[in-house]
């Protein structure tokens, strides 16, 4: 059955999970947690050339309005409690993108006494974007991968 037949009859069938996940992928509101030079590339991704708005990504200033956190840069031991506090203030469901080598595993500062060796020790990470610093294209690819992950989740029907 072609799409013309569906439109002529006036109805489309789908599951509630697919509908909910489709709406979630089209309205990702990230909380920016820019800690170092990776934040500049995150700003590039939000600017006119790459325009994350076309993916439904709108940066929000408050964690209570966000459902995605992008951790970009070196996470220090003093900043780790603040990262966890902001994560806890975000509404469910929430996702985390770790952007850059420093956020993924400490990066260049891996052996420093004051650096957390990966933000996944503080918050659960869904998508890792590698690079030092990763390009805006890499962040967009990470957002697309997060959208694909959200589409695969079961929100209502739990498979046993």
UniProtKB/Swiss-Prot annotation:
Gene Ontology terms describing biological process: aerobic respiration; electron transport coupled proton transport
Cell compartment(s), UniProt: Cell inner membrane
E.C. number: 7.1.1.-
Residues the record lists as binding [4Fe-4S] cluster: 37-38, 102, 132
Cofactor(s) needed by this chain: [4Fe-4S] cluster
GO cellular component: plasma membrane; respiratory chain complex I
CC cofactor note: Binds 1 [4Fe-4S] cluster.
GO molecular function terms attached to this record: 4 iron, 4 sulfur cluster binding; iron ion binding; NADH dehydrogenase (ubiquinone) activity; NADH:ubiquinone reductase (non-electrogenic) activity; quinone binding
Keywords noted in UniProt: 4Fe-4S, Cell inner membrane, Cell membrane, Iron, Iron-sulfur, Membrane, Metal-binding, NAD, Quinone, Translocase, Transport, Ubiquinone
SUPFAM superfamilies, per database record: HydA/Nqo6-like
Quaternary assembly: NDH-1 is composed of 14 different subunits. Subunits NuoB, C, D, E, F, and G constitute the peripheral sector of the complex.
HAMAP family, per database record: NDH1_NuoB
Role: NDH-1 shuttles electrons from NADH, via FMN and iron-sulfur (Fe-S) centers, to quinones in the respiratory chain. Couples the redox reaction to proton translocation (for every two electrons transferred, four hydrogen ions are translocated across the cytoplasmic membrane), and thus conserves the redox energy in a proton gradient.
Family: Belongs to the complex I 20 kDa subunit family.
UniProt xrefs under NCBIfam families: nuoB_fam (TIGR01957), PRK06411.1 (NF005012)
Name the UniProt record assigns to this protein: NADH-quinone oxidoreductase subunit B
Organism, as annotated: Cupriavidus pinatubonensis (strain JMP 134 / LMG 1197) (Cupriavidus necator (strain JMP 134))
Gene label: nuoB
């Amino acid at each position: 059955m072609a799409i013309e037949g569906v439109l002529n009859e006036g109805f489309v069938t789908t599951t509630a999970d697919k509908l909910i996940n489709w709406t979630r992928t089209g309205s990702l509101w990230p909380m920016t947690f820019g800690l170092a030079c990776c934040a500049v590339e995150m700003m590039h991704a939000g600017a006119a050339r790459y325009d994350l708005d076309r993916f439904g990504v709108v940066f929000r200033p408050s964690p209570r309005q966000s459902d995605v956190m992008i951790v970009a840069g070196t996470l220090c031991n003093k900043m780790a409690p603040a990262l966890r506090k902001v994560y806890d203030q975000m509404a469910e469901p929430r996702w985390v993108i770790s952007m850059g080598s420093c956020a993924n595993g400490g990066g260049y500062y891996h052996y420093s006494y004051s650096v957390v060796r990966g933000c996944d020790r503080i918050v659960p990470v869904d998508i890792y974007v590698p690079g030092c610093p990763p390009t805006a294209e890499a962040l967009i690819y990470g957002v697309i991968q997060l959208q694909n992950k959200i589409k695969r989740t079961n929100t209502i029907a739990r498979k046993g």
